[in-house]
Amino acid sequence: MTIDTVILDIEGTVCPITFVKDTLFPYFLTKLPSILSSIEFPLSTSSSTNDDPIIQILKQLPESITISNESVFSYLKNLVDQDIKDPILKSLQGYIWEKGYEIGDLKAPIYKDSIKFIENFNKKIYIYSSGSIKAQILLFGHAEKDQESINLNPFLKGYFDITTAGFKNKSESYIKILNEINKSNDPSSVLFLSDNVNEVKSAIESGMNSYIVIRPGNAPLSDDDKSTYKTIHSLDELTL
């Protein structure tokens, strides 16, 4: 088996699964009220000419939601609390996180073995996450290494999210990615790494190779899963 392309999940694979839920999500909800308070509600049709990126994102919500900043906050907080993969939410989160990274509030705790792999794998690496592509680029652009912020994006070939590839538990999403990266005729040369069993199963159904990455804090695997799928605990274990 010759692998020349690796697709990486983010949460629970290259960084702790707790980073998103314990750091990024709370940061978003902390900053959101002050941002919403600066916007005039209800959003009128005249807002369509406003080039404020926040307003342009919020305009995609149903009018029944954008009647007040309280209703918008309640709606978005519910999506966050339920961990619903909503594209509008992801866009807004990406914008707010960008500001957090820029001012140094946020740094991404990428695992050391993941940084090492990304920096030294001399073939193609793609990212596929439910988080927006913008959020992915921000995260890898502000990876923490030796207490400094480093940019890993130059080592990455491209990015996919639920708006460009589809949901990660669907095999057709991986087939779409194979087409996008010109690997539809050679899917076995592609390896997808994820902490999620359903994602790994879907990737395998597309013809890719796929391993489950076991990290501290990840959901425990059943004995059946451990016997069915190849597992690794670190990207250092890869021999490609």
From Swiss-Prot:
Which InterPro entries has this protein been placed in?
Answer: Enolase-ppase_E1, ENOPH1_eukaryotes, HAD-like_sf, HAD_sf
Where on this chain does substrate bind?
129-130, 168
Pathway(s): Amino-acid biosynthesis; L-methionine biosynthesis via salvage pathway; L-methionine from S-methyl-5-thio-alpha-D-ribose 1-phosphate: step 3/6; Amino-acid biosynthesis; L-methionine biosynthesis via salvage pathway; L-methionine from S-methyl-5-thio-alpha-D-ribose 1-phosphate: step 4/6
Q: Which cofactor does it need?
A: Mg(2+)
Reactions catalysed: 5-methylsulfanyl-2,3-dioxopentyl phosphate + H2O = 1,2-dihydroxy-5-(methylsulfanyl)pent-1-en-3-one + phosphate
Q: Which GO terms describe its cellular component?
A: cytoplasm; nucleus
Record keywords, A-Z? Amino-acid biosynthesis, Cytoplasm, Hydrolase, Magnesium, Metal-binding, Methionine biosynthesis, Nucleus
How would you summarize the oligomeric state and partners of this protein?
A: Monomer.
Name it.
Enolase-phosphatase E1
Q: Which organism is it from?
A: Candida tropicalis (strain ATCC MYA-3404 / T1) (Yeast)
